[in-house]
Amino acid sequence: MKIVSFSLEQGNKYFGDIDKDRFFIGKSVPYLRNKGLINNTGTPGQKYDRNDFRPAFGFWADFIHPTAMAEGALYHTLNTYDGAHFTFSFLQFAAHVPNGDFVRYFRELLKLPLAAQYFPDLALHNNRISLITGAVPVSLESDSSTTDLMEYLNPSIKSIESTEVIQAAKFIHWVQNDPQHRQTQIEIGITIFKEKMVEYARRYGLDGVADTICLVIADIRHQGRASSAEIQTALRSSKPLDNLLDIGKSRFPHRIDVLRQEIGVLTKAGTLGVRKYSAAKNDFV
């Protein structure tokens, strides 16, 4: 079992220690009336690199790249200060959505060999993340709620508790030291983007539409920064890509700048701008 110790240093920075390995957990930040942890710093080797995953996932490894960069791209990207209570991964999977990306990700993590080392009190029971407190496992999530899971990870977003720091430390140390954990992040991220493209193609009429336009729509929906009506209005315009990229630029200027930059680089390289989405194949051709 992995034992976590941690210290608060320099006023607002938390550092952890597992197996005599010291690492940065995150820094304390205020958010509206909340308070939590953020970790968005790391080395290039701790970031998603599409080249590493193209052999296994093909163009989809490139397709998610701009969104990954906009989300920070670090496998240990963390925030615990907003309504999701706990957000983690290179695509910032959020714990507040029932059967959502974080829940699906955590379920898969609990199947890995090291799961019992990091979370000995959890197990999958009927494919639900469950707390093992006695003879009967107690599910922490359902089709309608993840409240118990959020509280398990981070009891309150009003202050920083030891539980929150320890759970964050486990996720960070695990992903930094286990290639299978990182692979799981990628598999879940790409699987969900592929599934969502089926929905988006149907809702927005994206069969035969350019990869760049599909990518921006997927990013908008991933972040949740616009309604379907706004997306449809941009799609009907004379410059759909530009108008889609303009959505949310006043509220999220950095994210939009990153998207524009990464799409531009990949387009110039001939990676983007040459494929269209095929609804029949659920793939870009």
Model features per residue range: what roles?
Residues M1-G208, T212-V285:
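Cell-wall polysaccharide-cleaving catalytic domain and substrate-binding groove, primarily
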